[in-house]
Amino acid sequence: MPEGILTGGLSTSRNLQTILDSNCYTVARLACFCDNAFADAQQEQASLCAADGTLYRDDSGRRWLDPSKPGTLRYITDLAKECAQMGFDEILLDWFLYPISGDQSALELRADKTVVLKDFAQALEKQLPEGTVLSVVLRETPSADNGVTAELLASCFDRVYVMPDADASALPTGYDRATRVVTMAGYAPESGSYLVTQ
């Protein structure tokens, strides 16, 4: 594992296994392409780079993985498979999009963003154990700039979790919002701990 990647200890593993062994429906939320530590550690194999070969940084200084690189697919697939094999019912991909802030002209993209994301999602889904639900977080309104489209969401994911700032009206007509759309809380209640159920 690359340096800078944090892992939990034995008590974390025990606590997690207690939850996974319960009757709770469990969701593993994975940061997909916005990943500073892995981008820093695996620049040539997985990182989104500018045309001059330097790591791409968005306006917030975050580094990104390049979905078109095999190393990125291998890394995310390994994480998702491990979570599914541990017993998680659902894999939720967060940051499943291209960055839209930062110097876009510096990027050297190899192919159409939407095609790359669709190929990535389909390749990942094929590697997951049968019955594992694959979902995605909709952080921004779908656009050609970030590579996310309504068709991509409908064809590649079992559910779409919608962040407060995203426009869910961009989902395809006829999309079953009752079973395939989850509205995410924008903030934790002031009372402290909480559990979201449906």
Regions found by a protein language model. Give the residues of each.
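Aromatic-lined carbohydrate-binding/catalytic grooves of carbohydrate-active enzymes
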Residues: 1-10
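Generic structural signal for well-ordered alpha-helices
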Residues: 12-17, 80-81, 117-125, 150, ...
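Substrate-binding cleft of carbohydrate-active enzyme catalytic domains
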Residues: 14-33, 80
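Aromatic-lined carbohydrate-recognition surfaces of secreted/lumenal glycan-active proteins
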Residues: 27-31, 35, 92-93, 113-149, ...
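Active-site-adjacent "subsite" loops/lids of carbohydrate-active enzymes
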Residues: 33-81
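Active-site-proximal loop/short-helix segments
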Residues: 42, 89-115
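An active-site-proximal structural segment forming one wall of the substrate-binding cleft
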Residues: 64-96, 150-153
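C-terminal active-site rim and adjoining tail of enzyme catalytic domains
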Residues: 172-198
